[in-house]
Amino acid sequence: MQFKKLSVLMPVYNEEIAVAANILETDDYFKKLGIEYEIIVMDDGSKDKTYEKVKELNNPRVMAFKQRINEGKGEALKEAFKKSTGDMVMFLDGDLDIHPRQFEVLFEVMKTKNADVVIGSKRHKDSVLNYPKNRRLMSAVYFFLVKLLFGLPLKDTQTGIKLFKAEVLKNTFHKVLIKRYAFDLELLVLAHHKGYKIAEAPVVVDYKGKFGHIKFKTIFNMVWDTLAVFYRLHIIRYYDKQQ
């Protein structure tokens, strides 16, 4: 399996302290791989100088854009994809809790399993996690809910690194309505519903200790969005409608 160009879509929000270093680290890694690539940084309405820090890099392989207001990671990724030109697309969170070098692991799984989509999975048996206990508990409960509602052949949907053949996103993104909490789930449910093969790969996650307690509002919105996906899939069959 070959590809002509990789588009790395990197959503960021209020990351002015680390964003420049993280982008340079990402650029350096892909430069050493010797592949054709572009890095598209989408600032999701940051209130600090994140966007300015990216622009200051003046790197021809890095394109920077900014949303007028904060609309959510999902919307940022959709807008970034519109700017992309690669036939292979990777989602990569801008905080680099997951290092870009894991692209090689995901791409190898894509080749080996002849998959259309490969997602990093915190629940993969070979994953290495520096991950708060409260987040692990929430992940386990959410996995149970997703399995119950959708029966997806996946153990994780929310990890911030994913690799797609661009055609998958071209055929699914226009149907994705969720902008924030369950965006990843809706995209993967839709891809699976359309018959694309999705595989999982192990990840090394190095959370940097910036997470506090999970807010009740976040949990509520996550569950609400998840039920909305179920409603669109099984009740009104929105994803089957032509658009």
Describe the residue ranges of each PLM region.
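A conserved acidic beta->alpha catalytic loop
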Residues: 43-51, 96
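Short helix-capping segments at alpha-helix termini
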Residues: 30-35, 57-62
